[in-house]
């Protein structure tokens, strides 16, 4: 019984600490614009059509990688 009560108190205490910490850190992100620009540049960094896209290449194709020729291809336009 004592152990159960201690576990319940510990869980409540840890939950309260998490909630207090979350409230204190709201809106305090530094260099917000720098971080978002970096994410965008990483997301758009891709291999153009006609270039090799095999397993040794670290970037992804802007379109899709042909499974047979391992060449980046553009998506067909309808």
Curated annotation (Swiss-Prot):
Signal peptide start-end: 1-22
GO function terms (MF aspect): calcium channel regulator activity; ion channel inhibitor activity; toxin activity
Protein origin, superkingdom: Eukaryota
Compartmental location: Secreted
Gene Ontology CC entries for this record: extracellular region; host cell presynaptic membrane
One Pfam entry name: Conotoxin
Disulfide bonds: 46-62, 53-65, 61-72
Tissues expressing this chain: Expressed by the venom duct.
This protein's UniProt keywords: Calcium channel impairing toxin, Disulfide bond, Ion channel impairing toxin, Knottin, Neurotoxin, Presynaptic neurotoxin, Secreted, Signal, Toxin, Voltage-gated calcium channel impairing toxin
Propeptide residues according to the Swiss-Prot or TrEMBL record: 23-42
Database matches in InterPro entries: Conotoxin, Conotoxin_omega-typ_CS
Family classification: Belongs to the conotoxin O1 superfamily.
UniProt domain comment: The presence of a 'disulfide through disulfide knot' structurally defines this protein as a knottin.
Primary role: Omega-conotoxins act at presynaptic membranes, they bind and block voltage-gated calcium channels (Cav).
Protein name: Omega-conotoxin-like SO-4
Organism encoding this protein: Conus striatus
